[in-house]
């Protein structure tokens, strides 16, 4: 199959799954911003999503996108290293034309995945997962946290904020390269559009990750009872 046997096909899969995940990350940042304005409204959104079939279907699609993106990232990295052979040891420093994020996308991606797992443990495992256990597995008596309770509980921990800020920084680097690279891989980039996509990438990543950072800081202040 072209998508698996061709290096171009594998890059297309990486690009499409990456763009899909970028949209989800953007939605997630905007949804969290609701909690900055009204915790009651945020609770209502969490209750609306919950463990209903459409929320579970969306979760399954997102999980599939993440898995595909990770698998193809390792696949392409191994393929590229085999193609370069010993040449990769010949150069000790990064060429001036190669961005730092570009050269470290796999490492950044691994760090982001570890950060994502922590986030899932702090929120999904305490909100949606218990609902699934109760609604579909008949395991009653499981503690189900609301959105506000989960936020305040997570950010009351002194280590949460610094880890999240480092995670958002890694995500920023990953997105600044990933967005324009994705459009380049699907053939929507040329000498005119490439600088534009790079500009869009920088702005998009800065706005989304900046919003995440502001949310984390405000949630920490709220959890400490300062407001």
Label for each model-derived stretch:
Residues 1-227:
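Membrane-embedded alpha-helical bundles that constitute the cytochrome b-like, heme-associated redox core
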């Amino acid at each position: 199959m072209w998508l698996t046997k061709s290096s171009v096909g594998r890059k297309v899969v990486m690009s499409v799954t990456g763009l899909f995940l970028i949209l989800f990350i953007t939605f997630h940042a905007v949804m969290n911003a609701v909690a900055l304005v009204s915790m009651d409204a945020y609770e209502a959104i969490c209750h609306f999503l919950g463990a209903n079939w459409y929320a579970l279907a969306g979760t399954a699609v997102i999980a599939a996108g993440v898995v595909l993106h990770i698998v193809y990232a390792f696949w392409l990295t191994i393929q590229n290293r085999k193609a370069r052979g010993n040449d990769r040891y010949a150069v000790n420093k990064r060429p001036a034309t190669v961005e730092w994020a570009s050269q470290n996308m796999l490492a950044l991606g691994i760090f982001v995945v570890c950060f994502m797992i922590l986030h899932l443990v702090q929120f999904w495992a305490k909100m949606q997962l218990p609902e699934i256990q109760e609604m579909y597995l008949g395991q009653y008596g499981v503690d189900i946290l609301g959105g506000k309770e989960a936020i305040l509980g997570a950010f009351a921990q002194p280590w949460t904020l610094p880890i999240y800020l480092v995670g958002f920084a890694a995500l920023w680097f990953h997105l600044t390269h990933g967005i324009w690279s994705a459009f380049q891989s699907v053939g929507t980039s040329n000498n005119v559009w490439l600088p534009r996509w790079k500009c869009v990438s920088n702005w998009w990543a800065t706005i989304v990750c900046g919003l995440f950072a502001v949310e984390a800081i405000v949630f920490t202040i709220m959890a400490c009872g300062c407001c």
